[in-house]
């Protein structure tokens, strides 16, 4: 009898160790869609594209653990409703991220009333996703087109307070082993091997510090880099470019692996396609990304 009890106890200990080990956590499959742009006059096929993408995702086997819509959902609250109703037919849960077509310096409250928090975290298996509102990291409503050097405009004081609150919240989060940032506008542009950056040096395409400004609260990129460094986050899912790209960016000793999703509404750039990405995330946080084209989409 004593031997039997010892055997049972040993089995429980072994099972406990296995369940607590990283290998015991199943990998996660995340579908990222972006830039659906429902209601945009220059994207008349946007809704049809989204409906096609939803059908393709529902046909996946096995089904993804979650779907992330990384910004530029729609132009108006009516378009948001259309997008939500279309996405409601997905078998997987959907997480929304705000983009520059969703949140402006005048309508943050409207977005929150419709979608809930514009920055938050969620967990899939042992992977934590940190959703960040990139619209609180510079004024993307009043950027100066073609300005050299790139110079993002500071947020109005009332919205700057919201930015400070978000960065304070980010600083209060706990660093864990597997953590991924998600936002619409990427933290960095892509450095090209022949020189220059993609899409351009225009401050519209990435997060920048305001130049020639002594207000430390306007060091948007620096503050986010510091926050991600403290959280040991080195992977970011983003959209905004309408072009699927994977690249690594550095700032001092900080390194970030960026996975840019294609757009659902329309593509921008040579070779770009309309579609979505499927991210397979290992139990240790490694990310493998596959681009999937939207069937029959223009």
Predicted regions and their residues:
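Short acidic, glycine-rich surface-loop motifs adjacent to enzyme active sites
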Residues: 175-191
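Active-site His/acidic residue clusters
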Residues: 187-208
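Active-site glycine-centered loops adjacent to acidic/histidine catalytic or metal-binding residues
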Residues: 35, 71-72, 99-100, 184, ...
């Amino acid at each position: 009898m004593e031997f039997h009890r010892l055997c049972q106890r040993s089995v429980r200990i072994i099972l406990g160790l296995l369940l607590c080990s990283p290998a015991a956590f199943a990998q996660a499959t995340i579908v990222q869609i972006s830039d659906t742009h429902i209601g945009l006059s220059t994207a008349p096929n946007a809704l049809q594209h989204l409906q096609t993408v939803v059908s393709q995702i529902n046909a996946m086997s096995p089904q993804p653990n979650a779907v992330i819509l990384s910004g530029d959902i729609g132009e108006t609250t009516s378009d948001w409703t259309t997008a939500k109703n279309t996405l409601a037919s997905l078998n997987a849960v959907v997480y929304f991220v705000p983009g520059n077509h969703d949140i402006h310096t005048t309508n943050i409250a409207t977005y929150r009333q419709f979608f809930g928090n514009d920055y938050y975290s969620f967990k899939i298996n042992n992977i934590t996703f940190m959703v960040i509102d990139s619209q609180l990291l510079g004024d993307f409503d009043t950027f100066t087109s073609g300005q050299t050097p790139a110079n993002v405009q500071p947020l109005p004081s009332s919205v700057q307070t919201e930015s400070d609150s978000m960065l304070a919240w980010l600083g209060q989060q706990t660093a864990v082993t597997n953590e991924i940032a998600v936002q619409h506008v990427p933290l960095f542009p892509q450095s090209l091997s022949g020189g220059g950056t993609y899409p351009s040096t225009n401050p519209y395409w990435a997060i920048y510090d305001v130049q020639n400004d002594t207000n430390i609260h306007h060091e948007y990129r620096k503050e986010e880099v510091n926050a991600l460094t403290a959280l040991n986050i080195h992977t970011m899912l983003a959209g905004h470019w309408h072009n699927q790209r994977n690249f690594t960016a550095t700032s001092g000793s900080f390194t970030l692996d960026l996975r840019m999703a294609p757009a659902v509404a329309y593509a921008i750039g040579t070779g770009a396609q309309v579609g979505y990405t499927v991210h397979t995330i290992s139990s240790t946080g490694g990310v493998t990304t596959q681009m999937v084209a939207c069937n029959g989409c223009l």
